[in-house]
């Protein structure tokens, strides 16, 4: 049976939006994810810096040697209502720069939106340092290509990364792992629970009711994938 995934808008400020995504796996207690979204038009990065400080404190409490972060970069060219883009042309989507950086530590997600059309925009140095730190392990699906593209387009240098599909194959206990295996299907294999969810065939990038805000589906399913990737990474990287 597919999980139920719901979204609640918690705080709406001039700079950011805080969302709560509730996941209800079958026969399990609900899991609540907290997602901070930071849009491209907002100059105040203090909440992003606070988010990084917060997850590092959680890391210390967990006594984890390395900070494990899941990474799911995304681009609007493959979504409905995203606006015209040169990269919407057939065969060009993969060349488009990423426009949304989805990160997750435990139940805490950060959606940081950046825009390649604003080459002089200054991004929070704390975020770049966190991702490039050798003590940060960045995990994801098909992450090698994403790491290369982020460095090319935004000078984000991620030195310590792990592809979760490849790592699961190394264990040789999870059966065949397809090259396009989704976060939900990989979670079923690695975490041992049912994490299937019914996603819409197509999703909108923007919220049709609130101008320039991400759609609810974009936030809740992006948060789910980021959370599952984090949980898978923690499990596969156990000593």
Model segments located where?
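N-terminal accessory regions of nucleic-acid-interacting proteins
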Residues: 1-71, 77-79, 117-118, 152
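Conserved DEDDh/DEDDy metal-dependent 3′-5′ exonuclease domain
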Residues: 39-49, 65-66, 83-215, 220-235
């Amino acid at each position: 049976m597919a999980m139920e995934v719901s979204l609640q808008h918690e705080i709406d400020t001039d700079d950011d939006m805080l969302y709560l995504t509730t996941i209800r796996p079958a026969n399990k207690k609900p899991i609540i994810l907290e997602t901070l979204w930071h849009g491209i038009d907002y100059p105040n990065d203090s909440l992003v810096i606070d988010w990084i400080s917060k997850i590092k404190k959680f890391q210390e409490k967990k006594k984890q040697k390395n900070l494990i972060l899941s990474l799911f970069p995304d681009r609007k060219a493959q979504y409905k209502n995203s606006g015209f883009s040169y990269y919407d042309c057939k065969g060009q989507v993969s060349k488009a720069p990423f426009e949304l950086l989805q990160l997750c530590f435990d139940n805490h997600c950060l959606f940081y939106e950046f825009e390649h059309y604003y080459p002089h925009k200054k991004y929070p140095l704390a975020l770049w340092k966190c991702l490039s730190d050798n003590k940060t392990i960045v995990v994801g699906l098909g992450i090698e290509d994403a790491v290369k593209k982020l460095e090319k387009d935004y000078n984000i240098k991620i030195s310590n990364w792990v592809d979760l599909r490849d790592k699961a194959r190394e264990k040789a206990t999870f059966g065949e792992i397809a090259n396009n295996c989704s976060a939900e299907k990989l979670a079923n294999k690695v975490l041992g629970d049912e994490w299937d969810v019914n996603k819409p065939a197509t999703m909108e990038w923007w919220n049709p009711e609130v101008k320039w805000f991400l759609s609810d589906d974009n936030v809740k399913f992006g948060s789910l994938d980021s959370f599952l990737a984090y949980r898978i990474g923690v499990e596969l990287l156990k000593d």
